[in-house]
């Protein structure tokens, strides 16, 4: 399913490389909303999924799990761009900024706690001292 074209459910979307790549290119990021039914059926994302061709990079695969790198190559209008991302955003060697951490916390906690309680909890969490 990782490389497969099917994405009918949120679970399938989370494990479909074609879907998450097409979503990132279409919407700029892959956040919680990416797995809502309306997004899973977004025509622009679906059209782009057909053009995504995932493959395993043997060199990068050999470094897993020590390193979680990814390489992406995009060809558009006859031009090819390639990028190597040696680590995932949010890993210890490429941490989220405080603002990114706040946004992620509120995005995930607000549906469960409510917006006001999530904001209140976030303020309290930032006041905790680490030992």
Spans of model-derived segments:
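Terminal-appendage/accessory-domain detector
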Residues: 1-131
């Amino acid at each position: 399913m990782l490389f497969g074209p099917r994405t009918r459910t949120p679970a399938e979307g989370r494990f479909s490389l074609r879907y998450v790549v097409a979503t990132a290119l279409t919407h700029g990021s892959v956040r919680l909303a990416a797995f809502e039914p309306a997004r899973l059926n977004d025509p622009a994302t679906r059209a782009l999924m057909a053009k995504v061709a995932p493959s395993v990079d043997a060199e990068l695969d050999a470094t897993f799990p020590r390193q979680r790198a990814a390489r992406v190559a995009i060809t558009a209008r006859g031009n090819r761009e390639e990028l190597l991302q040696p680590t995932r955003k949010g890993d210890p060697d490429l941490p989220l900024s405080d603002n990114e951490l706040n946004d992620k916390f509120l995005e995930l906690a607000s549906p469960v706690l409510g917006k006001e309680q999530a904001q209140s909890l976030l303020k309290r969490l930032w006041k905790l001292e680490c030992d």
